[in-house]
Amino acid sequence: MSQNSLVIRNATIVDGTGIEPFKGDVAIENGIIKEIGNVEDIYNNEIDAKGKILAPGFIDIHTHFDPQLCWDGYATPSIEHGVTTVVTGNCSLSLAPIKNGGQDKIISMFQVIEDIKKPTFDAAVPFSWETFGEYLDHIKPNLGINVGALIGHSAVRLYVMGEDSQKRKATDEEIREMCDIVEKSMESGALGVSSSYVDVDENFDPVPSRFSCKKEKIELARAATKTGRGVWQVVPYFIDMETQLKNIEELGDISLETGIMCTFQPVLSTPDAPKAEQIMAALQKERDRGAKVFGQTMPRCFDLNMRLSETSMLLFGMPTWKAIMDLPIDERKKSFADNEKQKILIEEAKNAQGMSAALPMLKVGDVYSKQNEIYKGKYLVEICETEGKDIGQVILDIALADDLKTEFQLMDVINSDKESVSYLIMNELCHFGASDAGAHITQFCGTGDTTHLLEHYVRDTKKISLSTAIHRMTQEVANDWGLHDRGVIQNGKAADLVLFDINEVGISKEAFVNDFPGEASRYMRYSKGYEAVIVNGSVVYDNNGYTDARSGKIV
């Protein structure tokens, strides 16, 4: 369909403001909403939306689609879940600025932190740019979805300081150079800056942003606001609560010094802190100080899949396991099968700490050999007891029989208390976000949280009203993130819209598919119930799947 003229008739309109739904038509011309109500004019293209919900397109504020947008301008499967705008470049990582040779370090950080592999980069990410603006120019022509792109603090630091970016504080001159890059990037269309207090690189050394002082962060945030907008996104040191609370306080200082909106994720419900009480109290303290600091929370359980053929953050805490997981697949198989190495691996698994301590909570998912069929759906602790084996031995025996492809699942542990999750989703101290879509792709699919919210929390359990859910996914984040030209169905706003059947909308189980460049695999979550997704006036997805429209913009 052309974006020149379109009318959607007889819709139940949920306009994003939080008011009650109302019936009406919406007319679009040249990508802009022209009329709402009883549209009498005849348009080139018309959609009958009787019995369907028409809402603003959803905004996903935490994604890592930076590489994927080089070959997939739809950021699949985001659009089929009603998402019309994604924010990329989170957690201090972006693909620009970059100097010749600098891509190797960027790739290695993306591999470890975001689980996007080097063969994928080699096959589909050309690194034909240097500046952030040049990267945006590279992805623009192919966009079917809107992109709000953050500049990665680690990328900027690496560009200016090289190897020293992971050794020391920046000098005043280096800070000025970084600020100049941020200003120029913002002028080229960037949305803000991202940083990290917790991430590590391929050598388990802190990423460049973690070597910055508060002065550097404040100056970069101030540079980002010179265009009249800007956000400062971080991932805190969530491993230790005391440190995380200090991070939140520093965000408050940055906001108060510069006026920038600061945001961090994830804020999750855990068994020992169902409503994230300490974090929410820290957020309230900063709000009381006058700082603009928001958490990000999500509706789904934070479930993880582990395959020894891929990557797993559950193994990072065990050095021998981690070292073997870093090997090419053929060497990895030999190492895991080696009797002497197995003794070390089994001992490490017995004494696992951090995220690796969750290994006993795993159960067996998909299997690929006949002998492993008896284990499907069973918890590893159950198998250990039945067979008299240690946890490490059970994992190795099962995985080796499947050529390392066995799926081990960690489910219903984090963010599983639905009452507490409802509280967090509804709390004004948090934004709806933290999906991590486009990252950790061999461990989970972050895309689809929008559909899960509608299906479970709005329709099935009625814990959240439809108007409130839509408002939280659209106008609220659009306003706070500086996307003032969209996020609401109003005359003169961008025609980013989603049409769906609330009685049919739903999400599939995760599927492990092999569709990434470089023969890489990823988890996907498919949707149902979406009749049309419209980006800047053009239908990019309908009942027949994706169209050929490329109407996305840098926002």
What are the residue ranges of the model-derived segments?
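Acidic, glycine-enriched loop/beta-strand segments at the rims
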Residues: 14-25, 407-415, 421, 465-470, ...
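Histidine-rich, glycine-flanked metal-binding segment
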Residues: 2-6, 13-57
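Divalent-metal coordination cores built from histidine and acidic residues
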Residues: 71-192, 226-227
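Active-site neighborhoods of metal-dependent hydrolases
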Residues: 135, 143-144, 150-157, 163, ...
